[in-house]
Each structure stands twice: as C-alpha cells, then as structure tokens.
C-alpha cells in the first residue's frame, strides 16, 4: 500500500448520478417556553 490514495475513481465520479433528497429535521430543540415550563414543574415537585 502506498500513502497516497487512488484518486482515479473520484475523478471519474459523475455528480449527475446522485439523487436529490429532502432533508427532514428530526430532533428539534425545545423552545424557551417549554424549557421554562419543565423547570417550574421540577421546582414545584
């Protein structure tokens, strides 16, 4: 094995073969209101 990678495959790669995908946000961060509500619930218990 040599230290340099073989770039011939990369040079031949055709971007047109890639499919466009729609990204979906899965794990959204809670809003400030939600965080405050949870903090109050913990304090009151």
Swiss-Prot record:
Entry's Gene Ontology molecular function annotations: actin monomer binding
The answer on whether this UniProt entry bears the keyword Lipid metabolism reads no
Q: Where in the cell is it found?
A: Cytoplasm, Cytoskeleton
Q: GO annotations under biological process?
A: actin filament organization; regulation of cell migration
Region (Disordered) location = 19-45
For this protein, the record's SMART domains field holds: THY (SM00152)
* Residue ranges with Basic and acidic residues bias: 21-45
Broad class of where this protein is predominantly found: cytoplasm
Pfam families registered for this protein in UniProt: Thymosin
Which keywords describe this protein according to UniProt?
Actin-binding, Cytoplasm, Cytoskeleton
GO CC terms: cytoplasm; cytoskeleton
Q: Which residues form the signal peptide?
A: none
In terms of InterPro entries, this protein maps to: Beta-thymosin, Beta-thymosin_sf
Task: Describe the task this protein carries out.
Answer: Plays an important role in the organization of the cytoskeleton. Binds to and sequesters actin monomers (G actin) and therefore inhibits actin polymerization.
Q: State the family named in the UniProt similarity comment for this chain.
A: Belongs to the thymosin beta family.
| Name of the protein described by the UniProt record | Thymosin beta-15A homolog
